[in-house]
């Protein structure tokens, strides 16, 4: 499986505490920050909860 590049496109401020915790646990800090994570069920589950805040693209 390829990795996923996750980019924070909207701020996590004024969001539910669970959503803020997920953003922080993924290693995203400021808007436009990006991380590369493995494409597994745990990562996809986290992305599902904050899909409206992030942009996801597949990286080989």
From Swiss-Prot:
Keyword Ribosomal protein listed? The answer is yes
Key words of the record: Ribonucleoprotein, Ribosomal protein
Q: Which domain of life is it from?
A: Bacteria
- InterPro entries under this entry? Ribo_uL30_ferredoxin-like_sf (IPR036919), Ribosomal_uL30_bac-type (IPR005996), Ribosomal_uL30_ferredoxin-like (IPR016082)
Provide the Gene Ontology terms for cellular component. Answer: cytosolic large ribosomal subunit
GO molecular function term, any single one:
structural constituent of ribosome
Q: Name one Pfam family in it.
A: Ribosomal_L30
Similarity comment: family membership = Belongs to the universal ribosomal protein uL30 family.
Q: How does it assemble?
A: Part of the 50S ribosomal subunit.
Q: By its UniProt entry, which HAMAP family does this protein fall under?
A: Ribosomal_uL30_B (MF_01371_B)
- Protein name, UniProt field: Large ribosomal subunit protein uL30
- Species of the source: Leuconostoc citreum (strain KM20)
Name the lineage.
Answer: Bacteria, Bacillati, Bacillota, Bacilli, Lactobacillales
């Amino acid at each position: 499986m390829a990795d996923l590049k996750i980019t924070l496109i909207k701020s996590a401020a004024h969001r539910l505490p669970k959503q803020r915790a997920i953003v922080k646990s993924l290693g995203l800090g400021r808007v436009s920050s990006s991380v590369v994570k493995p494409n597994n069920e745990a990562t996809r589950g986290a992305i599902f909860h904050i899909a409206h805040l992030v942009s996801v693209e597949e990286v080989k």
